[in-house]
A protein has these predicted regions:
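Serine-esterase "nucleophile elbow" of acetyl-processing enzymes
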Residues: 1-48, 54-59, 72-76, 82
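Alpha-helical cap/lid subdomain in secreted, periplasmic
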Residues: 62-132
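Catalytic metal-binding/acid-base residues of hydrolase active sites
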Residues: 11-12, 49, 89, 107
Length: 132
């Protein structure tokens, strides 16, 4: 069985803007993906509202995606695929991030995935990465 980690922000979390809570479990895209894949893979949703690629948010601590990625990958290994859905929150005015800054944040996460995931796999290969 394959392991897929979906690492993202509120879209991965399943945030429902209509009520400020989460969509029901059955309505979240990660659950729908799991149902489509059936027993061929396990889908692990790792979403957090407001998560950034690598920016510290003084208004919402704990949202730096680079900080949590390391323990996340170690706790879920071995991982076959990481679906990376981050960058939208980097556009917040308070970060004053340029497209280059956001790209560097994504690049940092990709390098972390390529560095950490082979340590948890018997074949020593990096997990595949799907950047959304």
């Amino acid at each position: 069985m394959k392991t897929i980690v979906c690492y993202g922000d509120s879209n991965t979390y399943g945030y429902n803007p209509e009520n400020g809570f989460r969509y029901e479990y059955e309505e979240r895209w990660t659950t729908i993906l799991q149902k489509e894949l059936k027993d061929s893979a396990i889908v692990i949703p790792e979403g957090l509202n407001g998560r950034t690629t690598s920016f510290e948010d003084e208004l919402r601590p704990g949202r730096n995606g680079a900080t949590y990625l390391d323990p996340c990958l170690h706790s879920h290994g071995p991982i076959d695929l990481v679906v990376l859905m981050l960058g939208t929150n980097d556009l917040k005015i308070r970060f004053q991030a340029t497209p280059t800054d956001i790209g560097k944040g994504i690049d940092r996460l990709i390098k972390m995935i390529k560095s950490i995931t082979p340590q948890k796999r018997q074949d020593g290969q990096s997990a595949k990465i799907l950047l959304m």
